């Protein structure tokens, strides 16, 4: 009996018992709205030709500092050779413009600078945290009278998120998706 009690006293404190280990607390789903823009041959300013975009996401929280996010984004990409102030390439004398549907899917790793969460299982956690992310993605652009383009991209970005309550977050992020193709425009 003594051995059993001693073994329980040694092993029980080592057992991790926390709600954050339950799969339903580690996974999140969400939606987002924002703007999408393009910087390239026919747009030298990311603030020009901004278009609305919509996204859906799934996030898996490894711990209060690290997550993996899968997201799908839909928007429009617009550009025009009119009033372009970029140097390259040499533009033809005819005006060129495009308006394409854009679908982007990306998988990124997020790193929170402060432990993020609420409740007793997140000791020392904050409701607010800045974060950075990076990963890999794929983009499909179609429409506008041009052939469809499929390309790989490298998304990087930064943001801030705030935990409204145990089940709701509010986030704001800014990201760049570096396309590995010059055919989007």
Please name every model-derived segment.
Residues 31-35, 56-60, 107-111, 134-138, ...:
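Residues on the lipid-exposed face of transmembrane beta-strands in outer-membrane beta-barrel proteins
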Residues 66-149:
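Gram-negative (and chloroplast) outer-membrane scaffold detector with strong preference
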């Amino acid at each position: 009996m003594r051995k059993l009690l001693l073994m329980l006293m040694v092993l029980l404190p080592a057992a991790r018992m926390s709600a954050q280990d339950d799969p339903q607390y580690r996974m999140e789903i969400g939606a987002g709205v924002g703007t999408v823009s393009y910087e390239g041959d026919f747009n030298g300013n990311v603030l020009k030709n901004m278009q609305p975009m919509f996204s859906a996401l799934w996030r898996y929280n490894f711990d209060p500092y690290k997550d993996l996010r899968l997201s799908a984004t839909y928007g429009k990409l617009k550009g025009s050779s009119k009033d372009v102030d970029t140097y390259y390439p040499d533009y033809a004398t005819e005006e060129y413009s495009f308006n394409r549907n854009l679908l982007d899917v990306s998988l990124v790793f997020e790193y929170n600078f402060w432990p993020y969460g609420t409740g007793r299982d997140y000791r020392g956690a904050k409701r607010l945290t800045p974060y950075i992310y990076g990963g890999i993605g794929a983009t499909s652009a179609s429409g506008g009278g041009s052939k469809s383009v499929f390309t790989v991209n490298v998304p990087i970005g930064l943001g801030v998120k705030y935990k409204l309550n145990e089940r709701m977050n509010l986030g704001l992020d800014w990201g760049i998706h570096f396309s590995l193709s010059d055919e989007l425009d």
